[in-house]
A protein has these predicted regions:
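Aromatic-rich carbohydrate-recognition surfaces in CAZymes
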Residues: 9, 18-151, 156, 168-193, ...
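Glycine- and aromatic-rich loop/turn segments at beta-sheet edges
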Residues: 2-17, 58-71, 81-90, 140-167, ...
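Active-site core of glycosidic bond-cleaving carbohydrate-active enzymes
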Residues: 24-56, 129, 176-177, 181-192, ...
């Protein structure tokens, strides 16, 4: 369309050329676009402008620009007109089946461009209206449930989230935290844009969602996986990556996502139950007694290996510990994972998506740019927000200076 300027073009990353060929799968870019923002911000802005112009009329961020999972239905049902799309298609966007978490991926990437630019007001002016539009869409996906809906799966529990091969129902710890983080980002942008009314709405949604999670999910040791109020069905599994929302607020230099004492207690629980199973990473799901959750049953359905974890998620969890003052634990956790991938299993230029925590063997994925999440670690090691490395004497500033 006319929005695509010759000087911009459309820049997009391929999720995995050999295993999942598609352009700009939005959670993959959430995990992996930080070095683009640091070193090639014009390319990152080109991608962001495509996300904006591919956004649906009601505010849904696009799932992909095109490729092997191009689908039009949040349920995951394929639309036949999308099936022939090439792996490198750039003009067949759809809202996909992770609608409840596509929003934080989009909003976080927008905020990265703004924060890393030194809070450039022109960038804020261009991006904020779309952050607002998507935030309204995301927070009303289950509007009929009132405050609980802010931290719940969409109406009817339709679709899935980043951990897409699992059951998610009702109020969900992982989704809830991501939504609360999105509200923190949107509130700051609204305040800086002079949109006081929307900033107040974000605070209201945040307060309501936070109270709902504390009431229904906190059990004294961790946030249980999910609770469906309409049926009283719940999953009390320990989801090791339940604090992703907290990492986002830390990395973006924002106030807490979860109460501080809850974060510290949950991290201690997650560390304790995983220590007996793996030296190189944390299992995704464990039973309440700390044993590995069985694959093929209940929440895990039939896809994830009980000992498997996503490497990019492990890096975020390692940074959770760093931001809580435990650099001596968090940094070696990330290092052990990379040592296993690169030195033991020799995937130096072939970054996998998931590995087993007990053996380090790859369970899925080749050439995954999610692994560029590594570029978020320098800020976390120093306890800085993402803008730290771009400031005077920061790592990114020094690298660019050396290259010039």
């Amino acid at each position: 369309g006319d929005w695509c300027k010759p000087e911009d073009g459309v820049f997009g990353m391929n999720e995995s050329p050999r295993d999942c060929p598609q352009i700009e799968c939005i959670p993959c870019s959430f995990y992996g676009n930080q070095p683009l923002v640091y070193f090639y911000p014009k390319l990152a802005m080109s991608t962001m402008r495509a996300y904006i112009n591919y956004m649906t009329y009601d505010g849904a961020a696009p799932w992909v620009f095109g490729g092997c999972t191009a689908r039009s239905e949040p349920s995951g049902a394929r639309n036949e007109r999308h099936l022939p799309t090439a792996a490198c298609a750039m003009n067949v966007p759809c809202r996909g089946y992770q609608t409840t978490t596509n929003g934080i991926s989009f909003v976080a990437m927008a905020d990265r461009l703004w924060v890393s630019s030194g809070y450039d007001q022109e960038i804020l002016k261009e991006l904020y209206p779309w952050v607002k539009k998507n935030t309204i869409y995301t927070m009303t996906l289950r509007a009929e449930e009132g405050p609980d809906g802010v931290v719940s799966m969409p109406t009817g529990n339709v679709g899935t989230e980043w951990f897409e091969h699992c059951q998610w129902k009702g109020i969900v710890a992982h989704v809830g935290g991501l939504h609360l983080a999105q509200l923190r980002i949107a509130e700051r942008m609204a305040e800086e844009s002079g949109d006081k009314n929307f900033a107040a709405m974000c605070r209201m949604w945040f307060d309501e969602g936070s109270k709902s999670m504390e009431k229904h999910l906190w059990n004294g040791r961790y946030y249980i996986n999910f609770f469906e109020p309409s049926t009283n069905e719940k999953s009390d599994l320990i989801f090791s990556y339940q604090l992703d929302g907290e990492w986002i607020t830390d990395f973006h230099g924002l106030p807490y996502c979860f109460p501080k004492d809850r974060v510290q207690t949950a991290l201690a629980t997650i560390r304790e139950v995983n220590s007996r199973h793996s030296d190189i990473g944390f299992l995704s799901f464990l039973n309440a007694d700390g044993s590995p959750a069985s694959g093929g049953e209940g929440v895990m359905k039939d896809w994830y290996d009980p000992f498997a974890f996503f490497n990019a998620e492990l890096f975020m969890l390692a940074m959770n510990y760093m931001y809580e003052g435990q650099v001596e634990f968090g940094l070696p956790l990330a290092e052990k994972c990379m040592n296993s991938i690169v030195c033991k299993h020799l995937h130096t230029w072939d970054m996998p998506n998931m590995i087993r925590g007990d053996t380090g063997e790859v369970t899925f994925g080749k050439d995954y740019y999610q692994m560029l999440m590594l570029w978020s670690l320098p800020a976390a090691v120093k306890g800085q927000d993402m803008g730290g490395p771009t400031r005077e004497d920061g790592l990114v500033t020094r690298m660019i200076s050396a290259a010039n």
